[in-house]
Every structure is written in structure tokens, then in C-alpha cells.
Amino acid sequence: MTITFLILLFTVVKGDQICIGYHANNSTEKVDTILERNVTVTHAKDILEKTHNGKLCRLSGIPPLELGDCSIAGWLLGNPECDRLLSVPEWSYIVEKENPANGLCYPGNFNDYEELKHLLTRVTHFEKIKILPRDQWTQHTTTGGSRACAVSGNPSFFRNMVWLTKKGSNYPVAKGSYNNTSGEQMLVIWGIHHPNDDTEQRTLYQNVGTYVSVGTSTLNKRSIPEIATRPKVNGQGGRMEFSWTLLETWDVINFESTGNLIAPEYGFKISKRGSSGIMKTEKTLENCETKCQTPLGAINTTLPFHNIHPLTIGECPKYVKSDRLVLATGLRNVPQIESRGLFGAIAGFIEGGWQGMIDGWYGYHHSNDQGSGYAADKESTQKAIDGITNKVNSVIEKMNTQFEAVGKEFNNLERRLENLNKKMEDGFLDVWTYNAELLVLMENERTLDFHDSNVKNLYDKVRMQLRDNAKEIGNGCFEFYHKCDDECMNSVRNGTYDYPKYEEESKLNRNEIKGVKLSNMGVYQILAIYATVAGSLSLAIMIAGISFWMCSNGSLQCRICI
């Protein structure tokens, strides 16, 4: 008997298809989200400035006041080595070296010096005004000087101060006053000399048991010289102690002394207030402009954050400790696997992007008898671009509050306060850094979810148009039950697909496909049964043949019992 096996081959012919997908490119930009790290995206925006120009620049067109080798005290008192600072124009900020050489040439101290520096962070210009002319002290010698402040080997003194000493053998009570009619607050500085011993006291002032008294409407200060033997500094065993006050408009300051007074010749009218600061750096001014200055260099940026230096002056981004703050603006960048082809590459429409679609974020790929191609969905892409652009700009605008962070000065008696201040500032900085990083993580999560939602919406838009005229094939694609030429494809893309036009054709093709599926099931069942029976029969014949052969050669004894 001859058995003929009939092998049926079914060739599956794919119908016209349209897929929804999104753009992909060669970008290696990575962002972090709340749930993921190092997510590759097609587009991103860095909002953390990391660079500076390494220069000191004019701030908004106004140069800084460079003190050079002089300190704040040397400038205001008039150290002879600081003569170039006797008259200074408006400044944007003050540049002081870390350890300037020319401060108090005559050794001593400056009371409330750190508070004075803090005052200077709110001032951008002083007008120097003569308040107690040197020639008014007719009963005293006003040419006092010291070799500690020598110029060209000759004794000298602070240019803005007058050291009153005895005239002949007399030092009558010295009195002077100034009425502030300038219309602005006036910075007034004075001093008291503490001699090394009684001999020096009598040599300079004749009197012993002297005092220096200063009074305003809010100040009443009386100081007594402290005569003591001290180590010599700059060749001097004596010390000078300087104090200052802000004299209000129409207020009067009165000086009275029986000896040891360092009287002011000039006061400093606060002629212009503004945001300033003291920049501690060894750099010098260069020919450049900026809106934000740090000790390391100028920052020119519109970004809301920077990590260059915590101390800044001008319109500056907020300093954070972060190394990276990147906002996602594009989509997840997962290019399709080219070797697998378009329709085999995408397991889901948010699992693989199309590098071939370059004119939009979201769009379509179609395949029909006329060919295949990509087409971006311009409307959804533009809405997404506008939405994300507005969001990024809003984030930058909200966080781009301009800050100035100038260093605070503390004297040796305030170290505990300084340490507490540093801890507080570090705490605030940690909070700002955390807020910035959390903001970026949350916005990136929302942006990527936004893109996924837009692709899903586009998919649903197509699905609702096609209804049962096409089937979903589970990869972001639809296979039509009817022929769909380029005009038909375009109608699907622009939302004008005519469902009734293709309904009858789709219905017929859909029924035929169902019939083929049923007949296929019958054939498969018959083949399965036949294969089982044939296999069993073959096994039985094989066993019988082996048994017969073994019986014939004596290897197997066969007994037939009746």
C-alpha cells in the first residue's frame, strides 16, 4: 500500500499597515528621574552653569574699587601707601587681597571693623568731605607723624586723620563739632592713642589722666588711654584704637579731649547706595564685562544654577553643590534595531524610536502597495514643543531669582558665632541643592510621562478612526482589512478617515480570514491524529520484526500455548 502525505503550505500575506511611533536620534544625553537614573533622551537642557572666564570684570559697566596692597582700613584712614585711593569714583564692588600689606601702619586695632565691612556691601560710592579742618586746631600741633607710616624715610601719618599733640608745653582741652547738613548719612572715624609709658604720654600730650569723649544724638562714648609696656610693632610700643559711627542727617558729632585724640579731618558721605560687596582675591581687573562676579572669575549665563563658587556679587544664579542638573526636553531615546526591520523592531510603541522620522517628535510609518514612508504629526509635535518650552522657561524663571552671597566678617571674639553662621549657611545650601535636584527629577519624570501620553493619545486617535476596519497587531501598528493607498493613509493621519467607505470591504476580508483560521484548525487536527496513529503502527511493526528475528536465530524462545 502506498501512503501519500499531503503537505499544505500557507503563505501569509501582510495587508497594508500603519504604525504610530516617535522620533529617535544619535543623542547620548542622559537625565535622571524620580524612578530611573541615566535615561538616554533625544533632547535635554543643562540648567547648571559650570564655567567662568577666570577674570575680574566690570559689573554692569561699572569697574570695581581695587584696593591693591591696601586694606579697607588703610583706604579709609588714608595710609600714606594708599594715596591713589584718596579720591575714588563709584564702584560696583571692592577688591581686597587676602592679606594686604598696607593697613594700620601705626599698630593698633579698628573697633567694629567687620561691621564696617558689612556696611560697605550696601554702598557703591563715598564722597569725601572735610568736616574738621586741620587749621581749626590752633592751640595744638597738627603735624604729628610716625616713622611707622614713613614716606621716603620721613615720618608721616594717616592722610584723613589729624594727630593732635601739645603745642609748646600745653595741651588745652580740644573741642570740635560737625553738623551733618549733607543730606545723607556720614561715616565718621576717630581714634585714641595708647602710649607705651608715662614718658611718652607727657612728651606728646603733657597731661596725664586724659580722656577722649565723642557724642551724637545716639552715641555717648568716653575713652581713657591705656598706658602699658607692649612689644614693639613697626618700631612702636604704643597703639592706636580707631572707632567709627554713622552720623545721621542734621545730627551733630562733638569731640572733646584733654589728650591722645586722633581727630577726623574728613568724613565719608554715603552718596550712593546699592548692592556691592568685598571680593577677596589676588586677581586684578581685566577688560571685560559681566553681570555676575565670583572670586574665581566672571559668570555670563542665563541659567538658574551654578556650582563655581559660593561667594558671588551681581545678578547671579543660585549656587548649589550639584555636579549635574539636566532637564529632559525630548523623548526617551531608544532607536529601533535596524537589522530586525521596522515592524519587527518595536515590541510596543514606546519601546523603539524611529531615526528616519526627523521632522517631528511623534508620527506615522505606513506600508502599502505604493511603498512605505514616515510622516510626522506636526500638530501634536508643536503642542508638545510649546508645552515643554514653556515649562522649561517657567522653571528657569522661577528659580532664576538673582542672588548675592558675600562673605561675612567676624573678629577673633566671634569665632563661635562664625562657626554657627557657617553651619547655617551650609544647611541652607544643602536645602537649595536638594530642592534643585528634586525639581529636576520631578520635571524629568513628568516630561517623559508627557511624551508617552502623547504617543498613546495619537495611537488612540487612529484606533478610534479605524475601529474594526483594521486590527491591532500589538506593536503600535494596525493592519488594514482593506486596501489603503496613500490618499487613504493621509486621511488616517489628518483625522478625516472615511470609515463607511471601507466598511464593506473590511467586513468581507475579515470574514475570509476567520474562515481560513477555522479550516486551518481542522487540517491541523487531522494531521495530528494521523501522525499519532502512524507513529504507533510503525512502533508495533518494528517490535514484531525484532522479535521474529530473535526467535529465528535462537536468541529468543517462542512458545505458543493453546
Swiss-Prot record:
Main localisation: virion
Pfam families: Hemagglutinin (PF00509)
Annotated glycan sites: N25, N26, N38, N179, N180, N300, N494
Membrane-topology annotation of the record: Single-pass type I membrane protein
Covalently lipidated residues, kind S-palmitoyl cysteine: C551, C558, C561
PTM field: Palmitoylated.
GO MF terms held by the record: host cell surface receptor binding
Protein name: Hemagglutinin
